Amino acid sequence: MQQVVNEKLIEYAKKYNIKLVCTNDVHFVDEENAEAHDRLICLSTGKDLDDPNRMLYTKQEWMKTREEMNEVFADVPEALSNTVEICDKVEFYSIDHAPIMPTFAIPEDFGTEEEYRKKLTEKDLFDEFTRDENGNVVMDEAAAKAKIERLGGYEKLYRIKLEADYLAKLAYDGAKRRYGENLSEEVQERIKFELHIMKTMGFPGYFLIVQDFINAARHQLDVSVGPGRGSAAGSAVAYCLGITQIDPIQYDLLFERFLNPDRISLPDIDVDFDDDGRGRVLNWVTEKYGQEKVAHIITYGTMATKLAIKDVARVQKLPLSESDRLCKLIPDKLPDKKLNLPNAIAYVPELQEAEVSPNPVLRDTIKYAKMLEGNVRNTGVHACGTIICRDDITDWVPVSTADDKETGEKMLVTQYEGSVIEDTGLIKMDFLGLKTLSIIKEAIENIRQSKGIVLNIDEVPIDDPATYRLYSEGRTIGTFQFESAGMQKYLRELQPVRLRI
């Protein structure tokens, strides 16, 4: 069929004076990978190797060299020339990009970018973004110019400055709610320092977005939100914005563990929502920023050593007992070496015997398992990572779709996995669903219905002697982060009587 199509393509190209190009359908890298690819197709289609009706390829789908392509298409040299022409036009580019911060809608009565462009000069911005929070010069001119460039130039700085000022307003409003109208010098200095770091690293928009969906979850969607976890708990600004419920000043937590200008990296705030409400928060975010601007992150499941053996053995119909025997020969770890099939074979004599076995099915199982080990076996969706983009996601990265397990609807998924996404500059937010929060929420409702008491979990005292007795006895089954046998044992040894960090 392909031959017939090719002949017609050549005919039409000449008839209508259209340039013809030649391509090669590539599914694997080298010619010797053809048989391994054949077995991979059997796995993906659920067929056995000896099934006459299974999907078959020509085994010519390796990435051919220039010489091989010239030989295959020797009868249409003009198509080869046209292909080279396209190749010469392909532009090399890097996917690495500065952070692509989503646009947070700031009320116009607070200020606009246009107003900021009129009232601020580039010199004003240069000084503000390259000096410390007290206006002191802290870097030479070359380093200062490099920093302005890294932030996206003055065109971006006007937006960052507007977001930073609005963030400061929200932070100080929140600080008065947390600490009272008259802020202590310590609180003022801490907030001033943190806001300056957030601004000069280019991240005020990030905090505006996070506080926005957290406050929407709490006050609009009736979703329980965790008090905060990880290094974000060290931020007083996050505490004032309602992102966290832990006072870092009271507990002497370090902000520098969270954001540090000497270690340029995107902020990473893990936000816990109750299991039942997480989906509602994601829907709210999608509706606010647009379906084309919000995507989940793909995950790639690869074939581990034992799985590669089992999969190849299955399609080749190696007896299950023999497949199990091979898998049991794989050690859990190897001394001073990475655990993979070639290293395991070098370490285990029985695997060496299987590799040269007179039984061709056994021998081929080892041979092709070695080739397929580490290959992508399936794809999934990151449990909590979600991208919110300034533009349509497709403007920046390739996407696919996946089924939402909760709603059954299609959702966008990036084709780059998490380790690559940060390099592209896309902003990842972590929306975690926590069963513990659902249980606490249900308990509070049960107390309200049975006792008539309206309980605020954020105001529960942390100095209750009866609670500490439970912890000291290790009676923490079902308690988040304290339910493992090891933690219960440690609590019995520690005998905690107070909470201090």
For each feature predicted by the language model, list its residue ranges.
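Alpha-helical scaffold/interaction cores of sigma-54-like transcription cofactors
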Residues: 1-501
